[in-house]
Swiss-Prot record:
One of its GO terms (biological process) is ATP synthesis coupled electron transport. SUPFAM superfamilies: Cupredoxins (SSF49503), Cytochrome c oxidase subunit II-like, transmembrane region (SSF81464). Gene3D superfamilies: 1.10.287.90, Cupredoxins - blue copper proteins. This is Cytochrome c oxidase subunit 2. It comes from Acheta domesticus (House cricket).
């Protein structure tokens, strides 16, 4: 989860988030090199007092500063296209979960079992000081780790956005439309998210909490909830 004065990205908890962090670092390094090079050239031009009276045109340098940006864009575009493909790639999901956004809470449905499991998830009351303020909920979303998960996201009233940063997932919840996101959690723990689309007066008060457990505990939770 996000912490006070943290300027970095959240720790990765899924393969998708790892790839997003790698692409961020890759692009940032290219931008840093471009910034340093341009700053160096500008400083040299500013402090250099010599003038070349015969330099009226330079075909070579014009070719260079046309080709180099094109090559730079290719180095950014290829990893970006690969990542876009990975984000939309649909593996063979073991579990399908439906997420429905409301003003101002989330509803969840597990449809792969004998009895459909459905519940609402509201923000915990502020007088519960043992929990994180504005982030904890009364019913957590339980999911197994190391399992391919498909989430179908929609809304019942206005546009919401189901976002969990540590997993690298962000999907719009649009009324009358189903959006799909695939992910896999690679470690146990609690992962916090929030609605990322302004949806009304209480937009800031509809958090998301995913609890990642091993498959055995997940099956036990399914049995207990069904009974």
């Amino acid at each position: 989860m996000a912490t006070w004065s943290n300027l970095n990205l959240q720790n990765s908890s899924s393969p998708l988030m790892e790839q997003l962090i790698f692409f961020h670092d890759h692009t940032l390094m290219i931008l840093l090199m471009i910034t340093v090079l341009v700053a160096y050239i500008m400083s040299m031009l500013f402090f250099n007092l010599y003038t070349n009276r015969f330099l009226l045109e330079g075909q070579t340098i014009e070719i260079i500063w046309t080709i180099l940006p094109a090559i730079t864009l290719i180095f950014i575009a290829l990893p970006s296209l690969r990542l876009l493909y990975l984000l939309d790639e649909s593996m063979d999901p073991l579990i399908t979960m439906k997420t429905i956004g409301h003003q101002w809470y989330w509803s969840y449905e597990y449809m792969d079992f004998k009895n459909i499991i459905e519940f609402d998830s509201y923000m915990s009351a502020l007088d519960k000081l043992s929990s994180f303020r504005l982030l904890d909920v009364d019913n957590r979303t339980i999911l197994p780790m190391n399992t391919q998960i498909r989430t179908l996201v929609t809304a019942a009233d206005v546009i919401h956005s189901w976002t969990v940063s540590a997993l690298g997932v962000k999907t719009d919840a649009t009324p009358g439309r189903l959006n799909q996101i695939n992910f896999m959690i690679n470690r146990p723990g609690l992962f916090y998210g929030q609605c990322s689309e302004i949806c009304g007066a209480n937009h800031s008060f509809m958090p998301i909490v995913i609890e990642s457990v091993n498959l055995k505990n997940f099956i036990n939770w399914i049995k207990n909830y069904s009974s």
